């Protein structure tokens, strides 16, 4: 039965998401739920006494007020019955009955949407990686879905904004409520709404209360194909996002970080337990989705690609002699000559994969794509091996775009 939108708003606002969906499934209509006799609520399994009382004293006054506010602030109300309700949400264990959205319309089922999450207490490394990965994902045609809280979420949002392409920010409170009440916080909210989309399960005017973040995380995961966790401590809410993704059958990707850093202890543990895929850049995530979105995903712009290895200078003719002024002896600055290290002689210090990657780095290959191609190491092992070499101090990652040997590696004898 097609129900007036205000009945959907009434039911979604009255009860928690899972309970509201259970009531809807019982009556198959929010109007029927609103008009039902009190004794019928006793037939719905799992309802508390308080929830039954709320249903018995039903009123549409608040729903009318919410819809008036939505109309005034140009906030869209997407209900379970609507054609543009994302199919991805319907597959959730407890799909929301209503989603509020402000900004550009977004057809999620057509998007290679990737969620990004991370700790609020992000390290400079975590903030940079969140920003760089979000930027590359967006430039390659993906839709970044993230939060707006300081730390990794905010860095990811800024990275996507820098590209000029759409993004989605999922809020715990209303889409009209800045998380930070400063002028910069208000400008950020307006900027995201202009360039992308703000979404929430909470009606307008709702503050960003701590108890709402679980529902926010469920929506974040539900709208996405996979989740990137940048940094998370042992008790970070980001681990809740990762668990939700696993429960919904979404792949989880993790950016490896310093073993001794408290802000990455949780994400590193996901890698240790083989519960997540290690990644170093956005392109590594999208490798799993090219076949599903062949016309939407594309290579990163040239400015974002990893640098290729330099071409060696042409060899001199076989019979040519070095040109030299008469009476002058050519001086060679021996310090400027690169030192060649045969990593193959160091099997007691490095694994075969490490030797192959270190040799490729020494030959001048710097991008992960080039390193994989020239070392012969499979992508999953290459990523984890490079990460371990970085932690041991033999490989440097000055930007997320390329890798180099460190002085420690070059000084090996």
Question: What are the residue ranges of the model-derived segments?
Answer:
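Short, small/acidic-rich helices and loops at N termini and domain boundaries
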Residues: 1-81, 394, 400-401, 407-413
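Glycine-biased, small-residue-rich flexible motifs in mid-sequence functional cores and linkers
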Residues: 1-3, 79-413
């Amino acid at each position: 039965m097609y129900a007036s939108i205000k009945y959907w708003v009434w039911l979604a606002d009255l009860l928690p998401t899972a309970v509201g969906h259970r009531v809807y499934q019982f009556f198959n209509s929010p109007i029927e739920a609103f008009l039902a006799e009190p004794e019928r609520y006793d037939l719905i399994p799992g309802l508390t006494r308080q929830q039954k009382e709320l249903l018995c004293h039903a009123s549409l006054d608040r729903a009318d007020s919410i819809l008036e506010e939505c109309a005034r602030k140009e906030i869209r109300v997407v209900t379970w019955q609507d054609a543009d309700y994302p199919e991805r949400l319907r597959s959730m264990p407890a799909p929301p009955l209503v989603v509020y959205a402000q900004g550009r319309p977004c057809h999620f089922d057509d998007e290679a949407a990737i969620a990004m999450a991370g700790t609020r207490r992000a390290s400079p490394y975590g903030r940079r990686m969140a920003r760089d990965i979000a930027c590359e994902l967006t430039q390659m045609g993906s839709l970044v879905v993230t939060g707006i809280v300081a730390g990794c979420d905010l860095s990811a949002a800024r990275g996507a904004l820098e590209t000029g392409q759409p993004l989605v920010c999922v809020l715990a409170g209303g889409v009209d409520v800045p998380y930070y009440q400063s002028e910069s916080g208000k400008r950020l909210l307006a900027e995201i709404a202009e360039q992308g989309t703000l979404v929430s399960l909470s009606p307008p005017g709702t503050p960003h209360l701590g108890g709402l973040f679980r529902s926010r995380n469920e929506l974040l995961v539900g709208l996405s194909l996979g989740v990137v966790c940048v940094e998370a401590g042992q008790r970070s809410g980001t681990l809740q996002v990762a668990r939700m993704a696993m429960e919904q059958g979404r792949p989880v990707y993790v950016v490896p970080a310093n073993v001794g850093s408290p802000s990455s202890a949780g994400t590193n543990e996901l890698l240790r337990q083989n519960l997540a895929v290690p990644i170093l850049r956005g392109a590594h995530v999208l490798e799993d989705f090219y076949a599903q979105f062949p016309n939407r995903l594309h290579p990163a712009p040239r400015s974002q690609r990893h640098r290729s290895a330099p071409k060696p200078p042409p060899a001199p003719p076989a019979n040519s002699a070095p040109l030299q002024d008469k009476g002058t002896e050519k001086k060679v600055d021996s310090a400027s000559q690169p030192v060649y290290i045969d990593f193959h002689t160091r099997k007691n210090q490095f694994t075969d994969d490490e030797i192959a990657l270190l040799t490729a780095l020494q030959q001048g290959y710097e991008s992960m794509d080039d390193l994989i191609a020239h070392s012969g190491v499979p992508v999953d092992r290459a990523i984890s091996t490079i990460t371990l070499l970085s932690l041991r101090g033999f490989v440097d990652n000055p930007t997320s775009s390329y890798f180099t040997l460190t002085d420690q590696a070059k000084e090996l004898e």
